[in-house]
Protein backbone atom coordinates (compact mmCIF):
# COMPACT_ATOMS: atom_id res chain seq x y z
CA UNK A 1 0.00 0.00 0.00
CA UNK A 2 1.01 3.67 -0.08
CA UNK A 3 3.65 5.04 -2.46
CA UNK A 4 4.88 1.62 -3.55
CA UNK A 5 1.47 -0.06 -3.93
CA UNK A 6 1.07 -2.42 -6.89
CA UNK A 7 -2.29 -2.89 -8.56
CA UNK A 8 -2.34 -6.42 -9.98
CA UNK A 9 -5.54 -5.83 -11.96
CA UNK A 10 -4.10 -2.79 -13.76
CA UNK A 11 -0.82 -4.62 -14.37
CA UNK A 12 -2.56 -7.68 -15.82
CA UNK A 13 -4.69 -5.50 -18.09
CA UNK A 14 -1.62 -3.63 -19.31
CA UNK A 15 0.56 -6.64 -20.12
CA UNK A 16 -2.27 -8.26 -22.08
CA UNK A 17 -2.91 -5.14 -24.14
CA UNK A 18 -1.17 -3.78 -27.25
CA UNK A 19 2.02 -3.04 -25.41
CA UNK A 20 4.41 -2.05 -28.18
CA UNK A 21 5.46 1.60 -27.99
CA UNK A 22 4.76 1.98 -24.27
CA UNK A 23 7.60 3.23 -22.10
CA UNK A 24 7.75 0.13 -19.93
CA UNK A 25 7.78 -2.48 -22.73
CA UNK A 26 11.57 -2.60 -22.99
CA UNK A 27 11.86 -2.96 -19.21
CA UNK A 28 9.46 -5.94 -19.21
CA UNK A 29 11.39 -7.64 -22.02
CA UNK A 30 14.65 -7.11 -20.12
CA UNK A 31 13.08 -8.62 -16.99
CA UNK A 32 12.22 -11.70 -19.05
CA UNK A 33 15.79 -11.73 -20.36
CA UNK A 34 17.12 -11.65 -16.79
CA UNK A 35 14.83 -14.55 -15.87
CA UNK A 36 16.07 -16.77 -18.70
CA UNK A 37 19.74 -15.82 -18.91
CA UNK A 38 22.66 -17.34 -17.01
CA UNK A 39 23.47 -14.52 -14.57
CA UNK A 40 27.22 -15.12 -14.95
CA UNK A 41 26.88 -14.09 -18.60
CA UNK A 42 24.97 -10.87 -17.89
CA UNK A 43 26.55 -7.90 -19.64
CA UNK A 44 25.87 -4.62 -21.39
CA UNK A 45 24.02 -5.57 -24.57
CA UNK A 46 24.91 -2.43 -26.50
CA UNK A 47 22.52 -1.54 -29.32
CA UNK A 48 19.20 -3.23 -28.64
CA UNK A 49 15.87 -2.99 -30.43
CA UNK A 50 12.40 -4.43 -29.99
CA UNK A 51 11.36 -6.42 -33.04
CA UNK A 52 7.97 -7.75 -34.13
CA UNK A 53 8.00 -11.41 -35.13
CA UNK A 54 4.73 -11.12 -37.06
CA UNK A 55 5.61 -7.87 -38.89
CA UNK A 56 3.55 -4.72 -38.61
CA UNK A 57 2.95 -4.36 -42.35
CA UNK A 58 3.34 -7.73 -44.10
CA UNK A 59 3.10 -7.84 -47.88
CA UNK A 60 -0.25 -8.89 -49.31
CA UNK A 61 1.40 -11.91 -50.97
CA UNK A 62 3.28 -13.05 -47.86
CA UNK A 63 2.78 -16.21 -45.84
CA UNK A 64 1.87 -13.97 -42.91
CA UNK A 65 -1.30 -12.83 -44.68
CA UNK A 66 -2.17 -16.42 -45.53
CA UNK A 67 -1.63 -17.67 -41.96
CA UNK A 68 -3.18 -14.74 -40.06
CA UNK A 69 -6.56 -13.16 -40.71
CA UNK A 70 -6.74 -9.37 -40.62
CA UNK A 71 -8.40 -9.57 -37.20
CA UNK A 72 -5.68 -11.86 -35.85
CA UNK A 73 -2.92 -9.57 -37.15
CA UNK A 74 -4.66 -6.60 -35.56
CA UNK A 75 -4.97 -8.46 -32.27
CA UNK A 76 -1.50 -9.99 -31.96
CA UNK A 77 0.95 -7.67 -33.72
CA UNK A 78 1.71 -5.28 -30.85
CA UNK A 79 1.32 -7.72 -27.95
CA UNK A 80 4.26 -8.83 -25.87
CA UNK A 81 4.02 -12.42 -27.09
CA UNK A 82 4.90 -11.19 -30.59
CA UNK A 83 7.87 -9.08 -29.50
CA UNK A 84 11.51 -9.97 -28.95
CA UNK A 85 14.86 -8.27 -28.38
CA UNK A 86 17.47 -8.09 -31.12
CA UNK A 87 21.04 -6.84 -30.96
CA UNK A 88 20.92 -4.29 -33.75
CA UNK A 89 18.82 -1.52 -35.17
CA UNK A 90 15.69 -2.72 -36.90
CA UNK A 91 15.75 -3.41 -40.62
CA UNK A 92 12.31 -2.93 -42.16
CA UNK A 93 13.01 -4.85 -45.36
CA UNK A 94 14.33 -7.93 -43.54
CA UNK A 95 11.75 -7.61 -40.79
CA UNK A 96 8.95 -8.23 -43.30
CA UNK A 97 10.34 -11.52 -44.57
CA UNK A 98 8.32 -14.70 -44.08
CA UNK A 99 9.13 -16.55 -40.87
CA UNK A 100 11.64 -19.15 -42.10
CA UNK A 101 13.51 -16.64 -44.25
CA UNK A 102 13.42 -14.04 -41.49
CA UNK A 103 14.77 -16.56 -39.01
CA UNK A 104 17.75 -17.47 -41.21
CA UNK A 105 18.63 -14.09 -42.71
CA UNK A 106 17.80 -11.78 -39.83
CA UNK A 107 17.24 -13.28 -36.41
CA UNK A 108 19.93 -15.97 -36.26
CA UNK A 109 22.57 -13.25 -36.69
CA UNK A 110 21.07 -10.81 -34.21
CA UNK A 111 19.64 -12.65 -31.21
CA UNK A 112 22.77 -14.49 -30.05
CA UNK A 113 23.05 -12.43 -26.86
CA UNK A 114 19.40 -12.72 -25.88
CA UNK A 115 18.26 -15.86 -24.08
CA UNK A 116 14.63 -14.71 -24.18
CA UNK A 117 14.70 -14.37 -27.98
CA UNK A 118 16.56 -17.67 -28.43
CA UNK A 119 13.86 -19.36 -26.36
CA UNK A 120 11.20 -18.28 -28.86
CA UNK A 121 13.05 -19.57 -31.90
CA UNK A 122 14.10 -22.81 -30.25
CA UNK A 123 10.50 -23.46 -29.22
CA UNK A 124 9.04 -22.49 -32.61
CA UNK A 125 11.69 -23.32 -35.25
CA UNK A 126 9.27 -24.02 -38.11
CA UNK A 127 6.37 -21.58 -38.11
CA UNK A 128 4.83 -18.57 -36.38
CA UNK A 129 1.06 -18.92 -36.59
CA UNK A 130 -1.96 -17.66 -34.61
CA UNK A 131 -1.67 -20.81 -32.48
CA UNK A 132 2.03 -20.36 -31.70
CA UNK A 133 1.86 -16.64 -30.98
CA UNK A 134 -1.11 -17.28 -28.66
CA UNK A 135 0.87 -20.00 -26.88
CA UNK A 136 3.90 -17.74 -26.54
CA UNK A 137 1.73 -14.87 -25.29
CA UNK A 138 0.32 -17.12 -22.57
CA UNK A 139 3.83 -18.29 -21.60
CA UNK A 140 5.15 -14.73 -21.37
CA UNK A 141 2.17 -13.63 -19.27
CA UNK A 142 2.76 -16.54 -16.88
CA UNK A 143 6.47 -15.68 -16.64
CA UNK A 144 5.71 -12.04 -15.86
CA UNK A 145 3.20 -13.10 -13.23
CA UNK A 146 5.94 -15.20 -11.62
CA UNK A 147 8.44 -12.33 -11.77
CA UNK A 148 5.99 -9.95 -10.09
CA UNK A 149 4.71 -12.52 -7.58
CA UNK A 150 1.14 -12.68 -8.90
CA UNK A 151 -0.27 -15.99 -7.70
CA UNK A 152 -3.41 -16.20 -9.82
CA UNK A 153 -4.50 -14.27 -12.89
CA UNK A 154 -6.74 -11.29 -12.21
CA UNK A 155 -8.33 -11.43 -15.63
CA UNK A 156 -7.11 -13.31 -18.68
CA UNK A 157 -8.56 -11.70 -21.79
CA UNK A 158 -8.81 -13.98 -24.83
CA UNK A 159 -8.90 -12.93 -28.47
CA UNK A 160 -12.66 -13.20 -29.02
CA UNK A 161 -13.49 -11.30 -25.82
CA UNK A 162 -11.05 -8.55 -26.77
CA UNK A 163 -12.56 -8.17 -30.24
CA UNK A 164 -16.08 -7.96 -28.84
CA UNK A 165 -14.94 -5.31 -26.37
CA UNK A 166 -13.26 -3.31 -29.13
CA UNK A 167 -16.32 -3.39 -31.39
CA UNK A 168 -18.56 -2.25 -28.54
CA UNK A 169 -16.37 0.82 -28.04
CA UNK A 170 -15.13 1.34 -31.61
CA UNK A 171 -17.85 0.31 -34.11
CA UNK A 172 -15.44 0.39 -37.06
CA UNK A 173 -12.87 -1.90 -35.41
CA UNK A 174 -11.54 -4.52 -37.87
CA UNK A 175 -13.52 -3.05 -40.76
CA UNK A 176 -11.55 -2.58 -44.02
CA UNK A 177 -10.21 0.89 -44.72
CA UNK A 178 -11.55 2.44 -47.92
CA UNK A 179 -9.58 4.67 -50.27
CA UNK A 180 -11.63 7.68 -49.18
CA UNK A 181 -10.98 6.79 -45.50
CA UNK A 182 -7.24 6.77 -46.21
CA UNK A 183 -7.31 10.11 -48.02
CA UNK A 184 -9.35 11.73 -45.25
CA UNK A 185 -7.15 10.24 -42.52
CA UNK A 186 -3.92 11.56 -44.06
CA UNK A 187 -5.46 14.98 -44.73
CA UNK A 188 -6.72 15.35 -41.16
CA UNK A 189 -3.43 14.10 -39.71
CA UNK A 190 -1.50 16.62 -41.81
CA UNK A 191 -3.86 19.33 -40.53
CA UNK A 192 -2.66 18.55 -37.03
CA UNK A 193 -5.42 16.35 -35.64
CA UNK A 194 -4.20 14.24 -32.72
CA UNK A 195 -4.33 10.44 -32.67
CA UNK A 196 -7.06 10.59 -30.01
CA UNK A 197 -9.14 12.98 -32.11
CA UNK A 198 -8.74 10.78 -35.18
CA UNK A 199 -9.73 7.70 -33.16
CA UNK A 200 -12.99 9.41 -32.20
CA UNK A 201 -13.66 10.59 -35.75
CA UNK A 202 -13.02 7.21 -37.40
CA UNK A 203 -14.52 5.10 -34.57
CA UNK A 204 -11.34 3.02 -34.27
CA UNK A 205 -8.85 2.61 -31.45
CA UNK A 206 -5.64 4.63 -31.23
CA UNK A 207 -3.49 1.65 -32.18
CA UNK A 208 -5.43 1.15 -35.42
CA UNK A 209 -5.10 4.84 -36.29
CA UNK A 210 -1.35 4.88 -35.65
CA UNK A 211 -0.84 1.68 -37.61
CA UNK A 212 -2.74 3.04 -40.62
CA UNK A 213 -0.90 6.37 -40.57
CA UNK A 214 2.39 4.50 -40.32
CA UNK A 215 1.48 2.40 -43.34
CA UNK A 216 0.27 5.35 -45.43
CA UNK A 217 2.95 7.90 -44.54
CA UNK A 218 5.89 6.03 -43.03
CA UNK A 219 5.49 8.08 -39.86
CA UNK A 220 7.02 6.43 -36.78
CA UNK A 221 5.56 7.00 -33.32
Residue ranges and their predicted role:
Residues 5, 21, 74-79, 83-160:
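Long, cytosolic, alpha-helical-rich C-terminal regions that act as interaction/scaffolding modules
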Residues 159-165, 213-221:
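Short, solvent-exposed alpha-helical "recognition" segments
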Residues 197-202:
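Short alpha-helical "recognition helix" segments of helix-turn-helix
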Residues 1-59, 76-80:
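Aromatic-lined ligand-binding clefts that engage carbohydrates, nucleic acids, or primary amines
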Residues 161-183:
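Short, Lys/Arg-enriched anionic-surface-contact patches
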Amino acid sequence: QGYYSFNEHVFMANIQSEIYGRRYTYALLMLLEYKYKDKSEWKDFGTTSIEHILPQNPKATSQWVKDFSKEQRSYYTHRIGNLCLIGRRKNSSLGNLDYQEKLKKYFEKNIGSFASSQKIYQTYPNAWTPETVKENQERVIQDLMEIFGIKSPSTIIDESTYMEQQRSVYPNAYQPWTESDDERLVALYNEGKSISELAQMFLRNRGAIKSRIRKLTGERF
